[in-house]
């Protein structure tokens, strides 16, 4: 029972005594002199007289980078045994942040040591006695202050009592003290530096708008006064002090170093080139077209004889019998386009169609030449028979090689245009014109590898032709056509008329098949390519009973006074019976 009673007695809460003001110590504090190393005063602050003083309980940091502890009679920094006595610092400024004033890294410490350079200040510990920071009003307990973060309200006044502080920091000989003000304009700064203590009182005062800072340092220091009249002069000066030295480039390039680098690079290049120069080319096999530069040109050099292709070209040129129609013959009539007729809905399509019609009328492929050419041709003659053979061969070659339809129609068009300008008496040479027309069209329309002559020999009707002969005939074809080789063909106009007819795939396939078949008929040469293309689409629509479709084709095509479409349709009517 006694044990239970003892346990219950222990559990009873004891009344807590009244916590009065706890005295720091019964020992009397010694009287200290009032010394301040920093004095900040503003003319506006000096006008504010009678402001009550508020005190700071304690401070944990004197600098942003140092750790402060309270518990000894002195503030010590382990890195330097020398001491600097800091007395009392009074701050009287409405809205001024003491944390920014005392702990900000902008206000750097200045000691008597100028002999050592670039010492590290990390890892230093500072001990502050309880008496170093005294609350002059309430005597409240110590509390920690965050030096970096916050700002104090406007009507605060803070005072610090003196304490013995030991610093171990070192300042380099070349260190310059730069002050940056976060307040408004018109700041004035004066700095007084020395090397020993002075017994003057220091005060730090600040205002909201204008600021004047005086830093009083021990009187035995070497004095260096610098004053700036206004903030307009101060701010550029501060920028010059802290920034100009950073903008200057300290690097200097030596000409000797650059010369040596050039020599080394040249030596490396010479070594690389020497390795390639010693390479053995005995196993190198040149391409079969390696000698084509001299064989297929006029001559290798000015002193060398003409090439074999050039000599063949001169022979073909002498054998060519030119017709009476001049080479630059143009259309005799300027046709007026009627704007009230049906047009394409798309403006781009309409513009492309009109430009193609203009090229057709103004190009070297002229209707009068074609009519004269057709009138001279006899079905029993040499030229119509050879032309039929060449057209069939061109169609077969394009099908076997998988060439485009544009190449097929351009090759046949070049052949007909050349024969309309003249012909040869030799059958062998006339067949060679067909080969050259296809190879030239292939160069224009096709991509690699078909845009060059890769065959060494061509065989048609038991006739063998060399590559030199084909190239020489290509030169003659281009010269006879006045180098106007890319002309509108029937296939170019088929797309426009099929679009106007709104043709389905069946009508489109039939129209293209009729176009290929019509190439063997020389009567289509008496009409414009656009007229032939429109007639072929009309025939394809008639076969599939698309009456409204071919009527739209007629309306789109008939834009000039010379409407030969009905005659062309009648002349090609036989194609539907094939």
From Swiss-Prot:
BP-aspect Gene Ontology terms: cell division; chiasma assembly; double-strand break repair via homologous recombination
CDD domains: CYCLIN_SDS-like_rpt2
Record bears the keyword Cell cycle: yes
InterPro entries on file: Cyclin, Cyclin-like_dom, Cyclin-like_sf, Cyclin_C-dom, Cyclin_N, Cyclins_cyclin-box
Keywords, comma-separated and alphabetical: Cell cycle, Cell division, Cyclin, Meiosis
Effect of gene knockout: Plants exhibit a severe defect in homolog synapsis recombination and bivalent formation in prophase 1, resulting in random chromosome distribution and formation of abnormal meiotic products.
Pfam families on file: Cyclin_C, Cyclin_N
Residue ranges, annotated region (Disordered): 1-31
Biased composition (Basic residues): 21-31
Superkingdom of origin organism: Eukaryota
Similarity comment: family membership: Belongs to the cyclin family.
Subunit-structure text: May interact with CDKA-1 and CDKB1-1.
The name this protein goes by in its record: Cyclin-SDS
Lineage: Eukaryota, Viridiplantae, Streptophyta, Embryophyta, Tracheophyta
């Amino acid at each position: 029972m006694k044990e239970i009673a003892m346990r219950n007695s222990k559990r009873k809460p004891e009344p807590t005594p009244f916590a009065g003001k706890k005295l720091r110590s019964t020992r009397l504090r010694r009287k200290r002199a009032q010394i301040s190393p920093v004095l900040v005063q503003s003319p506006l602050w000096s006008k504010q007289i009678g402001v009550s003083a508020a005190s700071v309980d304690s401070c944990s940091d004197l600098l942003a980078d140092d750790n402060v502890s309270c518990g000894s009679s002195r503030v010590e920094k382990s890195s330097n045994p020398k001491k600097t006595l800091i007395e009392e610092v009074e701050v009287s400024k409405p809205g001024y942040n003491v944390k920014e004033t005392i702990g900000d890294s902008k206000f750097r410490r200045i000691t008597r040591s100028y002999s050592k350079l670039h010492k590290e200040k990390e890892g230093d510990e500072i001990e502050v006695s309880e008496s170093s920071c005294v609350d002059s009003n309430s005597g409240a307990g110590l509390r920690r202050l965050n030096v970096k973060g916050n700002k104090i309200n406007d009507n605060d006044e803070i005072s610090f009592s003196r304490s013995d502080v030991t610093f171990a920091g070192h300042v380099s000989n070349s260190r310059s003290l730069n002050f940056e003000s976060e307040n408004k304009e018109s700041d004035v700064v004066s700095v007084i530096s020395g090397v020993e203590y002075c017994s003057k009182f220091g005060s730090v005062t600040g205002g909201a708008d204008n600021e004047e800072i005086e830093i009083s340092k021990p009187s035995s220091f070497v004095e260096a006064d610098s004053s700036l009249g206004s903030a307009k002069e101060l701010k550029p000066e501060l920028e010059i002090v802290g920034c100009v030295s950073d903008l200057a480039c300290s690097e200097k390039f030596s000409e000797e170093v650059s010369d040596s680098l050039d020599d080394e690079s040249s030596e490396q290049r010479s070594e690389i080139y020497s390795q390639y120069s010693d390479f053995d080319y005995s196993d190198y096999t040149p391409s079969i077209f390696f000698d084509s530069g001299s064989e297929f040109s006029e001559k290798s050099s000015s002193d060398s004889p003409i090439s074999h292709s050039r000599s063949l070209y001169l022979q073909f040129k002498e054998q060519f019998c030119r017709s009476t129609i001049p080479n630059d013959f143009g259309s005799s009539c300027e046709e007026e386009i009627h704007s009230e007729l049906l047009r394409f809905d798309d403006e781009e399509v309409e513009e492309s169609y009109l430009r193609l019609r203009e090229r057709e009328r103004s190009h070297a492929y002229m209707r009068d030449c074609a009519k004269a050419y057709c009138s001279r041709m006899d079905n029993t003659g040499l030229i119509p028979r050879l032309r039929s053979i060449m057209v069939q061969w061109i169609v077969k070659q394009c099908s076997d090689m998988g060439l485009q339809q544009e190449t097929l129609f351009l090759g046949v068009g070049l052949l007909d245009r050349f024969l309309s300008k003249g012909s040869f008496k030799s059958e062998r040479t006339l067949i060679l014109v067909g080969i050259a027309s296809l190879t030239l069209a292939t160069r224009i329309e096709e991509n690699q590898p078909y845009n060059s002559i890769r065959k060494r020999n061509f065989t048609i009707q038991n006739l063998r032709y060399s590559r030199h002969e084909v190239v020489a005939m290509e030169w003659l074809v281009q010269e006879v056509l006045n180098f106007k080789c890319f002309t509108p063909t029937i296939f170019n106009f088929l797309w426009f008329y099929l679009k106007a007819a709104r043709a389905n795939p069946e009508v489109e396939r039939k129209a293209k098949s009729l176009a290929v078949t019509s190439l063997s008929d020389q009567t289509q040469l008496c009409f414009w390519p656009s007229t032939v293309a429109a007639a072929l689409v009309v025939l394809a629509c008639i076969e599939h009973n698309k009456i409204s479709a071919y009527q739209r084709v007629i309306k789109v095509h008939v834009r000039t006074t010379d409407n030969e479409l009905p005659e062309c349709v009648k002349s090609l009517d036989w194609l539907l019976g094939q």
